[in-house]
Amino acid sequence: MTNREREILELIKKNPFITQEEIASKLNIARASVAVHITNLMKKGYILGKGYIINLDEYVLVIGGANVDIQGFPKEKLRYKDSNIGILNMSLGGVGRNIAENLARLNVNVKLITAIGDDMYGRKILEHSKNIGIDMSHSLVVSDDNTSTYLSILDEDGDMAVALSCMDICDRIGVDFIKSKKKIIESSKVCVVDTNIPKETLEVIAELEDVVLFLDTVSTKKAQKVKDFIGKFHTIKPNRYEAEVLTGIYVDNVDNAKKACEVLLNKGVQRVFLSLGEDGVVFGDSRGIFKIDMPKVYVVNATGAGDAFLAGLVFSYINDYSMEASAKFAMAAAAIALSSKDTISNKMTIQNVNTKAKEMGLC
């Protein structure tokens, strides 16, 4: 949605009986221009028909991976090339799906476009999504491929030691399929994409006009997919290693993190939140680049922290939080994820995130 379309829609929300002449007068534009903008709003689904019937069912769309997570937690210090005694936990995961579930737990109306197999794991993902409030009606379900699986082994500190993923099914989210979802994408308030989907598909999404695109770079290898068109994204959340891939700057300290942010902003990204892990977050937009330290958090499982952080950024954006407030809310959401053995914490609520932010001294 363009800024002008947003202005017109706000006027219509306040007064559904307002005329095009009155809108033109208030915004100091031609009535013919108002007519064009209203036609575009109807095409995008924000206005449902004549009489200015407004579609108030705003939603966030997430496009990305969904899979089954199998995690191993050692009971003692992790010994490589040896059998370790520990605990195995299976849960639903995938960067896109995780972001969508965190958003649903934050009471955000969310749709998920992903690819799953018509198998036991795929049906489990569909059932859970329905129960938690994630709309997967636009996802791809195939009978000739398996639902993605992600296996991770954590060390004694709760950090990931090694992981294996089989996510070939994400390649099924191809250009033709995503083009068939063009209206759903363009009608979203925010569209979140992760780099598990093919580069060609990411390029098609990035070229869509008037779509607020949030990007999760996922990993250093997958971040390379978007390096050449990173400036098409509104908001990105790389870690220091992914930022190095995108900028060529070795992010070994705060100054270099700020330089990396500056490079990304100069490429066209509107907002950058560069995660430095336990060292905090460097964030910036056209008004400047800043840093917030991360208060000490007890880490049980670091796997889902980045997904929770991005969900916190999306929640903050659609609720008009400032950059600083967005970073703090996202950090508190990540802290809740860090303290949970599950990839998605069942304590992820708006109230709990705000409480955690206060406990951490972020507000």
Predicted regions located by residue number:
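Conserved phosphate-binding/catalytic region of the ribokinase-like
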Residues: 1-20, 26-27, 31-32, 39-55, ...
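Glycine-rich phosphate/adenosyl-contacting loop at the front of the ribokinase-like
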Residues: 3-4, 8-10, 18-22, 26, ...
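Short gly/ser/thr-rich secondary-structure transition/capping motifs
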Residues: 43-45, 171-176, 215-221
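Conserved N-terminal subdomain of the carbohydrate kinase-like
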Residues: 56-57, 75, 80-85, 105-189, ...
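Short, conserved phosphate/pyrophosphate- and ester-handling motifs at nucleotide-, phospho-/glycolipid
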Residues: 103, 239, 306
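Hydrophobic anchor at the start of a short beta-strand
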Residues: 109-110, 136-137, 213, 272, ...
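Conserved beta-alpha-beta core of the PfkB/ribokinase-like small-molecule kinase fold
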Residues: 190-259, 280
